[in-house]
Curated annotation (Swiss-Prot):
Mg(2+) binds at D41, D107. Coiled coil: none annotated. Belongs to the endonuclease V family. DNA repair enzyme involved in the repair of deaminated bases. Selectively cleaves double-stranded DNA at the second phosphodiester bond 3' to a deoxyinosine leaving behind the intact lesion on the nicked DNA. Keywords: Cytoplasm, DNA damage, DNA repair, Endonuclease, Hydrolase, Magnesium, Metal-binding, Nuclease. It is found in: Cytoplasm. It catalyses: Endonucleolytic cleavage at apurinic or apyrimidinic sites to products with a 5'-phosphate. Its EC number is 3.1.21.7. Pfam families: Endonuclease_5 (PF04493). CDD domains: Endonuclease_V. It comes from Desulfurococcus amylolyticus (strain DSM 18924 / JCM 16383 / VKM B-2413 / 1221n) (Desulfurococcus kamchatkensis). The keyword Hydrolase applies. GO terms for biological process: DNA repair. This is Endonuclease V.
Length: 219
């Protein structure tokens, strides 16, 4: 049986209602208590999807472990449904890490999504783990300038922030799941390094998926 796109959209709408209802009860996260974070990303080679997850020491910003695996993309790329294409391989890669991260960073959006259920929210909800969406381009929502901050409003809520990187470019940080926006932005800022367009865990996951994973998997 083929992929049911209408059902996927309906599922996003149903689950996003639950997440938005929980938004104000998401806990604050004390940065001093964060031990490890994970970044996930994927690349494609000859029709094969290569997913990678990197576990990183949060304070030292040093990689602790990485995993990678291949999969056939379950569906083509469809705007708004990226989670159904890439989340399965990310979740499998995360399960293969030697320890569960305190926070997951995803190359993509969270609540700043047309149905408030981007890939970062999808993964965070499935794994019951705080998650953050980080993207180089906007997807959904209006930017409002408040006290010098560029906040992203969508679905009647502030769900993201435009953050300037060390390079002077902008990235779009959004709430995924189980994290407040202020904490998500603080985590992302801590993990940015000079010369990088995305936080270090995502950058390393991207590199692994494009180089070491391909060599190890002999693609």
């Amino acid at each position: 049986m083929g992929f049911d796109y209408q059902r996927a959209v309906m599922l996003q709408r149903i689950l996003s209602e639950r997440v938005l209802a929980e938004l104000d009860s998401f806990p604050r996260i004390d940065p001093s208590r964060i031990r490890s974070v994970a970044g996930v990303d994927a690349s494609y080679r000859g029709g094969v999807q290569v997913g990678s997850a990197v576990l990183m020491d949060y304070r030292a910003k040093m990689p602790l472990a990485y995993t990678c695996l291949t999969s056939k993309p379950p569906i083509p790329y469809v705007p708004g449904l990226l989670a159904f294409r890439e989340a399965p391989v990310y979740i499998k890669a995360l399960h293969r890490l030697p320890a569960k991260p305190d926070i997951i960073l995803v190359d993509g959006h969270g609540l700043s999504h047309p149905r408030a259920f981007g890939i970062a929210t999808h993964i965070g909800l499935v794994l019951s783990t705080p998650s953050i969406g980080v993207a180089k381009k906007p997807l959904y929502g209006e930017v409002e300038e408040v006290n010098g901050r560029k906040l992203v409003r969508a679905h009647g809520r502030i769900v993201g922030e435009v953050v300037e990187t060390n390079q002077g470019s902008e990235i779009y940080v959004s709430i995924g799941y189980l994290i407040r926006l202020e904490d998500a932005v603080e985590v992302v800022r801590h993990l940015m390094e000079p010369g990088l367009k995305l936080p270090l865990p995502i950058h390393l996951a991207d590199n692994y998926s494009r180089s070491k994973c391909i060599k190890e998997l002999r693609l």
